[in-house]
Amino acid sequence: MASRPISFVTGNAKKLEEVRAILGAAFPREIVAVKLDLPELQGEVDDICRKKCLEAARNVKGPVLVEDTCLCFNALKGLPGPYIKWFLEKLGPEGLHKLLDGWEDKSAQAVCTFAYAPDEQGEVLLFQGRTEGDIVFPRGSRDFGWDPIFQPKGYDKTYAELPKERKNEISHRFRALDKLREYFGGEGGK
């Protein structure tokens, strides 16, 4: 019997495209997009992901995958963190960069956490990836969130300036999905 597709809860077509590109054709399960209005939760990223995943599994009644992305400025002790979506919406890329005007430390961590549940009663598994970098004045395309202000360590370009293929080999999302792919390649993901 074939496994049911995994419902990736997102309304962001670019995110779905990136996830599929990173996982590749050899990934053993089909990933389908499902748009759900889940409650916007507050708290620590692991707790947010677990709760969001269980709520999604109750709605979908099957295997689900949810994602939460954080951008953590070291000078601001981890803020905006899981609230990056709201900061970006209100301030834009220039405003996010300007938040660090008073600090010498422009370093940051991009953090991506995927939560997977096989069903509504299943244990929620977390897969997290991190990329170190710096917050810079916006450069590059503005079609994917805060990519224009995040310059990964060891690079002279922002995520937005890098070719998609290169970004998908080094990003926080890649690192998290690599762990997910490893899980599904082993005994646990069957």
From Swiss-Prot:
ITP binds at residues 10-15, 52, 68-69, 85, 144-147, 167, 172-173. One of its GO terms (cellular component) is cytoplasm. It comes from Culex quinquefasciatus. Belongs to the HAM1 NTPase family. Binds 1 divalent metal cation per subunit; can use either Mg(2+) or Mn(2+). This is Inosine triphosphate pyrophosphatase. Mg(2+) binds at E40. GO terms for molecular function: dITP diphosphatase activity; ITP diphosphatase activity; metal ion binding; nucleotide binding; XTP diphosphatase activity. Keywords: Cytoplasm, Hydrolase, Magnesium, Manganese, Metal-binding, Nucleotide metabolism, Nucleotide-binding. It catalyses: ITP + H2O = IMP + diphosphate + H(+); dITP + H2O = dIMP + diphosphate + H(+); XTP + H2O = XMP + diphosphate + H(+). SUPFAM superfamilies: ITPase-like (SSF52972). InterPro entries: ITPase (IPR027502), ITPase-like_fam (IPR029001), RdgB/HAM1 (IPR002637). CDD domains: HAM1 (cd00515). Its cofactor is Mg(2+); Mn(2+). Pyrophosphatase that hydrolyzes non-canonical purine nucleotides such as inosine triphosphate (ITP), deoxyinosine triphosphate (dITP) or xanthosine 5'-triphosphate (XTP) to their respective monophosphate derivatives. The enzyme does not distinguish between the deoxy- and ribose forms. Probably excludes non-canonical purines from RNA and DNA precursor pools, thus preventing their incorporation into RNA and DNA and avoiding chromosomal lesions. It is an enzyme of class 3 (hydrolase).
